[in-house]
Amino acid sequence: MPPLDILLTEQPNLTYGQNIEPDIFPRRCFPDPCKHIKFNPEYADSVCGDPRLGPLTLPSRFPVSVETATYYRYGGLCADEFILRWAGDLDPKKWFNYPDFDGFALDSQGKPIKAEVTLTVGRKVDRFGSPKGKFVAPLGSSYISRSLPPSNLAPGKTGNYPDNYHVYMVLKPFSGFLGPVASWFGQPGLGSQIHLKSSVEELLTGGFLRELREDEYDEPSEYSYDPNPGKA
């Protein structure tokens, strides 16, 4: 018979009636990966029934599947450790704490690394989250480079893919602040983020951005590095 620790890492763990796949948490978190977490049946599709921990199943359709391919959800922490580290309290009403300086990485003097840039017509950017926010990223940035919490991968209000993932095209030039993302939520960050001066919602209303349909951003070449586009 295989050793117990092998069984625990190879078998889904039934917790609160959920199959917690062994690759979600480190093996040391088993056999009770959801200890100290209060299960909320309203969020039965979230890991351990806690919306802060994100969906049980990550999006499997392109392009989000590409952006999450390297994602290690909790940075080596168990569920309770992750929430205590990044929310400071296991109380379900306590949400995450976010980094200072709008989430930009800091230089050696502790100042945010950012510069004002102009987004030109035709540029595509994307976002995990509602249009009420002010952060976007270059199209196709990996999830780990964005330093976002697992909750941003949950479906939005409709519950349908890709409801909480949005792609936008610039229709009129406008400016924002571009810089590297600070490491946070157990992720390395260091991807590029753009902090907008107005919310995405306001830019949509003002005609500066247009949200693209799924069939308008499904070209694989837009999500990979190709130094010689169009050449074999």
Please provide the spans of the model-predicted regions:
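Polar low-complexity intrinsically disordered regions
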Residues: 1, 231-232
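Catalytic toxin/effector domains delivered as secreted proteins or via bacterial secretion systems
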Residues: 80, 84-230
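ADP-ribose/NAD+-binding catalytic cleft of ART/PARP-like enzymes
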Residues: 1-135, 142-144
